[in-house]
Structure formats: structure tokens, C-alpha cells
Amino acid sequence: MTRPRHAGAFVPVCAALLLAAAAQPPRLEPPPQTPIRGLTEAPLLARAYDLVYDADFAGADAELKRACGPAPAQACDVIGAAAQWWRIYFDLDNRSADQAFTARLNTVIAAGERWAAREPERAEAWFYLGAAYGVRVQYHGQRLEFLAAARDGKRIKISMEKALSLDPGLDDANAGLGLYQYYADVAPSVLKVLRWFLGLPGGDRVQGLAQLRRASESGVLLKAEAAYQLHLVNLWYENRIGEAIQMLSDLHARYPHNPIFLLNAAQAHEVYRSDRAAALAIYMELVNGARGGSLREPLLAEMWGHLGAAVQLTALAEPDRAADEARAVIARRPSAPYGAVAQAQLELGRALDALGSRDEAVAAYRAALGAVPAGDPRDTGRAARQGLSHTPDRINTEATRLSIEGWRTFERGDAAGALAPLERAVQLRPDDGVHRYRRGRVCLAMQDRARARADFERALQVRPLPPAPFVAASYYELGGIYEASSDRTRALSMYDAAARAHGASAKTRSLAQRALARLR
């Protein structure tokens, strides 16, 4: 399973916000009688921010140049810093741009402090100051710099509260405050004990969610950012996986050139739904989109796709295809994502081990160790050493090799030639549901329905069960066998099980649904 990129981005920020409140906040002066409300030239700035979210960084820079002048310079500087953060966020393991980024952001924050001091009655001055601190909190949180994040968390809360006190209709400010309210309430128990010990103000989960939703629906600048953070909340704490995936789909529809929404959707299917078939489909969409020119940051997108696909294919009993995906990365020797070659060599070793090619697998593990980048943020070295120290069971790997050989022969249209290697695979590992399913498909193609039915039934009885797509496909094929024998009741039962099976491939689910519609 690939480790989710960017996962936990706001967990350390949550801790930071709670710790920040330990310091006594300065007493806010009452707002002036004539506060200055609104965001100057908001449509121009929103256009630039939309380009950032669509990963069009050059376009965003050009749009900011047009917007600045009519729009406040500080607003443009904050959005420019956010764009630079997104560039880093795309490849978080790479720290080479950190120093330049923090220097730029510190300058932006200092300018924001001066603006708020000059015009304390202007809501947008406080808003952009809080937004600048928000960018830096994300950076500190990702780098596990908790004390620095805590200091900035306090400043975000103060700045956004000040902005809302001056302009209650400034919905964008609800994004930052909503995150504070939510995480202060749902924080892990250790943080709640700390909050009680220090006398920190508590949060309100319901209010926090409402503020995040308000910002995601009515915000001008931070609408997309609020939606992105809300999808993380839904994944991590609310257990609204489907809603989170739908939010990513909506973001991808709005910003179709940004590959990160596809990446995050693939990871959500993989990690939170254990739906490797759906994850694989999206990883391949990344590859195809990068090659076809529909995605920006094409190198990153394609490598994310190949690496993710390799992991899924090994888990889905197709290690030969997994090896091909890993080799596609190795052949490119990409500069990004950070450590991609080491990860690809590791996945190649795992795929080759599954196929029984131990010597080649050992070479791949050693190549992974040689390619591990500074800091080894993905812990690839440890995984490669484990691969070197563990020799797979030879009977298992031989059965897998034969099963793949037979299945690829069948895919080429040679059912008769596929049968012998699959027979041998089942003989070696009779309780492997993958081998049973594959032999069942060959028997069905050869009109031997009795043997096919026995294999599909056995694939559903073995423990552990085969990967989910094989379970769903076995139900579907049994439905076809029962339908052919005019057993409508059992056919409906099997088709229904196939359509409902968790982790079924999109093709199997569609075929089962069509069969149900036909029989009903």
C-alpha cells in the first residue's frame, strides 16, 4: 500500500492551534465605528487563485501581475506565496526549495503586519495577514515544526477573528476559524488533557464543520481551499469516505489540470476503502492524462500513476504488469517525485519476488538501496532490506508464475493453451482463489460449465479470500452459469452479490447491474 501523500497535513496544525491558545492572546480593541469591509478587486484575485488550484503557476503569476495595482500588493504577495507552497506541496519529500520559500513568506508576513498596523480598521488587512500565517502553518505542520506552527496558529486565530469582527460577511475567514473550532473539539485525548491543564478554550465540532462548509460554499478566495480541507476532515474523522471522494471529484471537475485531486482520490480508494480496482483505474488515469497533455506537472503525475499502479497490480495478483509499471519509472530516472527511482526499484523487487525471479528481485532491492535519497522520507531502505532478508515460498511463486502464464495465454485467445499451466497452478496451490477463478474462466470458455462452477464456488470458499475483484467476478460468472441453466433465482442472487461486492471492478459491477436489469 502506498503511503498517502500529504496525509496528516492538518493533524500537527491541529496540535499547533491548541498549543497556541496557551499563550494569553492580546486584548482586541473594539472595532472602529466605520470599518472598511470587503476584499478589493476580489474577482481578479479569485481568478489568480483559481489558476493556482488548477496548477497553472505561470498563468497565476501573469494574472497576479495584471491584478496588482488595482488589488492590494499584499493580497498578490500572499497568493504568490500560496502558489509557491503548492509547488512544494506537490513533492513534499523534496526540501530543496524550503529556504527560499520561508524567506519569501517571512517577508510577506512582515509586510502584512505593517499593513494591519497602518490600517487596523481594514478587514482585508487582517484577513491577508491571517492567510499568510495560514500558509506558513501548513509548511511548519508538514515539517513537524510544532512550536513554530503553534506561534503562527495563534496569529491566524487572532487575525481572522479581527477580520470577521470588522466584516462579518467575510466568509473566507471562516476557513481558518472553522479548522480551529473543529480540531479543538475532535483532537486526540492527549491534546484534550493538555487543553484542560492549560485552561485553553475548547472547540465546537459542529460549528467548525458549519464554518468550513460556509467557506467552501460562499468564500471568494478560499472556497476551494476550504473544500480541500473539508475532504480531509471527512476522511480522517467524520468517516464520510464517499463524501470526501465526491468532493475530490468536484475539485477535479473544477480544476481538471491539477493532478493532485486524482492522486488523492486514488489514495482514498486504496487506503480508506481498500478498493484497489478503483485506485488502479485512477492511477492509470494519471498516467494517461500526463501523456495525453490534459494534466499539468506531467512528470509528477505520470510517476505518481506508475508507482501507484505498481503497488495495486501486485496486490491484485498481476505482478508481471506491476513490474512493467515500475520499469517505466526506472527507465525515466525522473527528478520528481523525490526518491521515485528507489520506490520503483522496491516495487520491482516485490513484483519479481512474486513471480519467483529471486535473483532479479535481489538485484532490484539492492538497486533500491543504492537509489535511496537523502533522509529516506519513505523508509524505502528498510523495506528493501526486508525484501533482501525474506525469501518467498517457492511453491507459491511457481504457482503464481504458472497462473500468470496461463492467464496471459487466455487473454490472447488461446483457451486450450492456457489450461495446462493453470491446471498446474491449481495443483500446487488448490486453495488459492485467484488460480481457481482463472481456471474457471478457461473452463467456461471451453464449455466445461461443471468444472467452471466448481472453481468459482471454491474461489468464494477459500480463506483468505482472493482480492475483491476476483470475488465479485466469481459471483458474476456463477450468475451467468445459473442463468444459462434457467435457474433465475440463483442467477439473480449471484448477480446481486457481484453488483454489491466491495472492491468489484467497474466492468464487473456494470455487467452485473445490466444482468439484474435484464432478469428483473
Question: What spans do the regions from the language model cover?
Answer:
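TPR/TPR-like (Sel1-like) alpha-helical repeat modules
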Residues: 157, 200-210, 284-288, 353, ...
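Alpha-helical linker/edge segments of TPR/alpha-solenoid repeat scaffolds
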Residues: 87-99, 138-139, 184-192, 237-242, ...
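Short coil/linker segments at helix-helix boundaries
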Residues: 26-47, 51-64, 70, 80-169, ...
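Alpha-helical adaptor scaffolds
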Residues: 226-236, 270, 303, 307-315, ...
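Residue at a conserved register position within TPR or TPR-like alpha-solenoid repeats
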Residues: 51, 84, 91, 133, ...
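Amphipathic alpha-helical segments of tetratricopeptide repeats
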Residues: 68-69, 110, 158, 210, ...
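"A position-specific structural signal for the A-helix of alpha-solenoid helical repeats
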Residues: 46, 79, 86, 128, ...
